[in-house]
Amino acid sequence: MKKFIRNNAVFIGLSLMLIAALGLALLWVPKGDLHLLLCDRHTPARDIFYRYYTQVAEWFPYVVCVALLLFSRIGDGIFATSALILSALTTQLFKHLINAPRPLTWFGANMPDVQLPLVDGVRMNYWFSFPSGHTTSFFALFFVLCIIVTNYLAPNNAGDLTAKRSNSVSGLLQALLFVLATLGAYSRIYLSQHFAADVFAGVVVGVGITICCYVLFCRFEDRKWYNYRLFKKK
């Protein structure tokens, strides 16, 4: 577990910072005010970007899972598929148990004079707000990729020059993957599909379930079936 934390320290650290920042904001700022503060900076370019980028969570995880199953170790594909499915099921369970109103519904009932900045072409939802399923998918997906990539980049000798370069590349990739996940999470607030609390919970579920799945599967990494490849290198 220490090796896992060391190899993924950048992504884990940044995720914890994001969770802490959102948690403090939720404690200090009223729900409606926080949402308006976070979704108020609309421009035509941002509208287009977030409208389409948020859809990545709806199809890209399937592409990644299939690609890993076909072209990487079969164990990596099973790990990724398990993390994404379990995190999605956990989110859906809480969504239907809580059935919280989405921003459009909540503002209509509690702050009817406020006109939310909506984006043309985005189909709005009204219920099942907590947690954010897209946020869960974004963080589970990019954390899974982070774990797999850093596992390949992890140096055998942490003292040589090659190891230092590998650590630098790994750190930059982890930061990039975190940014991609965070942009996806923020798109849900920007589009007024979710509140900050929904995104907060989505990050926790996505990261938490992925860690649980890694702990479950890492013990099998030395097994022959885990390292089996459908398409072996010649």
Residue positions per predicted region:
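N-terminal transmembrane-helix/juxtamembrane module of multi-pass inner/ER membrane proteins
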Residues: M1-V63, K95-V122
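Membrane-embedded catalytic cores of phosphoryl/pyrophosphoryl-handling enzymes
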Residues: K3, V114-K234
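Alpha-helical transmembrane segments of integral membrane proteins
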Residues: V10-L14, G75-A83, L172-L176, A197-A201
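Aromatic-anchored segments of alpha-helical transmembrane domains
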Residues: A21-A25, I85-L93, V179-S192
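Hydrophobic alpha-helical transmembrane segments
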Residues: T54-L70, H134-F139, V149
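Interfacial segments of alpha-helical transmembrane regions
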Residues: V66-L93
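Membrane-water interface at transmembrane helix exits
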Residues: H35, A67-L70, T91-N99, P103, ...
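Membrane-helix interfacial "entry" motifs
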Residues: K3-F4, T43-R51, V64, L68-S72, ...
